[in-house]
Amino acid sequence: MQIYLVGGAVRDQLLQLPVYDRDWVVVGSSPQAMLAAGFQAVGKDFPVFLHPNSKEEHALARTERKTGVGYTGFACHYAPDVSLEDDLLRRDLTINAMAQDNSGQLIDPYGGQRDLAAKVLRHVSPAFVEDPLRVLRVARFAAKLHHLGFTVAEETMQLMAKIVQSGELQHLTAERVWQEWHKSLSTNHPEVFLQVLRDCGALAVVLPEIDRLFGVPQPEKWHPEIDTGIHTLMVAKQAAQLSDSLPVRFAAQVHDLGKGVTPPSEWPSHKLHCHTGLNIIESLCERIRVPNEFRDLALAVCAQHSNIHRADELKPTTKLKVLGLLDVWRKPERLEQVLLCCEADHRGRLGLENEPYPQREIFLRAYQAALGVAVQAVIADGFHGKQIKEELDKRRVSAIEAL
């Protein structure tokens, strides 16, 4: 029985990135031998075991053969005679197909080190096309490693386009699409995930709501970049620079989906996009099972971002109404999240990336002023029932007016 560290842990170690999960491959063993050695069986589809002490996953070396559609349509073969090289050959990218033995010796049969040095994401073998999930995984790795200068090899991009054309992407489950998108949100460059998917034609299949934004014009006066799709990528980039919050990054990426359904006769104006975008966000989130926390923030940003951009023009009553619609009295963290998305939207425009966003301060001050009005004081002054809310709002408006 030989045990090797494999995959992402080896890659990230060589890139001097933090290693969070360590996966191991066991060569020359069997399920019976693993159980006898004290390992605990956990694999449903193929033999994976937890180490008795570290609880890290150890998988028996295996090969895979395509038997059906989608990323689950594989037959696994595992046996003591499956070599480490056989196991590494079935992996997606050369930089993920390296192993390390217990003495620290690197095993790299498919040129992973060469591609690490060249900063290239390249498929290991032509069998890459058999698993549609790899399209999303490569896009995510492109986002994860973009800050180091990594790009997708042209021939790998061609294979990704081939997977898209085969129709296999349609067999990905909603959960897997969300899982990869969600992971991409935690990278330094989430916009690269969307860009790579668009470059190979996958965005139109997995996230058509975002794909249809490309080619839709906006008024050049406000949007020098003109194209709504390009604006969305720029906003995604700005949101990642402004905030580590994944719901904020998600909401920023979907805030303008309503522009994708504006009739061309109305272009470049999008007067109703804050309204039309709501149903699109609802159905997108339902389709790929986006958690409520992400959905609710996205809906709030979609509905109110245009109002917040006009903060200096709004009457005190309107500012208070917007704060109420954002539910900030019950969810005080919501305002900061929405304002971050709006700032990303404001800066996600060509040549305006470093533009200040005074609207943020205007709304924060309005919120603090309104918050300073105590409901207890209203009750103490003898107001009852519905009168309490009316008087509270009146006093809050006065507090905002006094700024």
Swiss-Prot record:
Binding site for ATP: 8, 11, 91, 137, 140
Start and end residues of each HD domain: 228-329
InterPro entries the UniProt entry points to: CCA_bact, HD/PDEase_dom, HD_domain, NT_sf, PolA_pol_head_dom, PolyA_RNA-bd, tRNA_CCA-adding_enzyme
Catalytic activity field: a tRNA precursor + 2 CTP + ATP = a tRNA with a 3' CCA end + 3 diphosphate; a tRNA with a 3' CCA end + 2 CTP + ATP = a tRNA with a 3' CCACCA end + 3 diphosphate
EC number(s) reported in the record: 2.7.7.72, 3.1.3.-, 3.1.4.-
Role according to the record: Catalyzes the addition and repair of the essential 3'-terminal CCA sequence in tRNAs without using a nucleic acid template. Adds these three nucleotides in the order of C, C, and A to the tRNA nucleotide-73, using CTP and ATP as substrates and producing inorganic pyrophosphate. tRNA 3'-terminal CCA addition is required both for tRNA processing and repair. Also involved in tRNA surveillance by mediating tandem CCA addition to generate a CCACCA at the 3' terminus of unstable tRNAs. While stable tRNAs receive only 3'-terminal CCA, unstable tRNAs are marked with CCACCA and rapidly degraded.
GO biological process: RNA repair; tRNA 3'-terminal CCA addition
Residue numbers binding CTP: 8, 11, 91, 137, 140
Binding note for cofactor: Magnesium is required for nucleotidyltransferase activity. Nickel for phosphatase activity.
Needed cofactors: Mg(2+); Ni(2+)
Protein name, entry field: Multifunctional CCA protein
Entry keywords, A to Z: ATP-binding, Hydrolase, Magnesium, Metal-binding, Multifunctional enzyme, Nickel, Nucleotide-binding, Nucleotidyltransferase, RNA repair, RNA-binding, Transferase, tRNA processing
Binding-site positions, Mg(2+): 21, 23
Alphabetical list of Gene3D superfamilies matching this protein: Beta Polymerase, domain 2, cca-adding enzyme, domain 2
Gene Ontology molecular-function annotations: ATP binding; CCA tRNA nucleotidyltransferase activity; cyclic-nucleotide phosphodiesterase activity; magnesium ion binding; phosphatase activity; tRNA binding
Protein family per UniProt: Belongs to the tRNA nucleotidyltransferase/poly(A) polymerase family. Bacterial CCA-adding enzyme type 1 subfamily.
Coiled-coil blocks: none
Domain free text: Comprises two domains: an N-terminal domain containing the nucleotidyltransferase activity and a C-terminal HD domain associated with both phosphodiesterase and phosphatase activities.
Quaternary organization: Monomer. Can also form homodimers and oligomers.
Leftover remarks: A single active site specifically recognizes both ATP and CTP and is responsible for their addition.
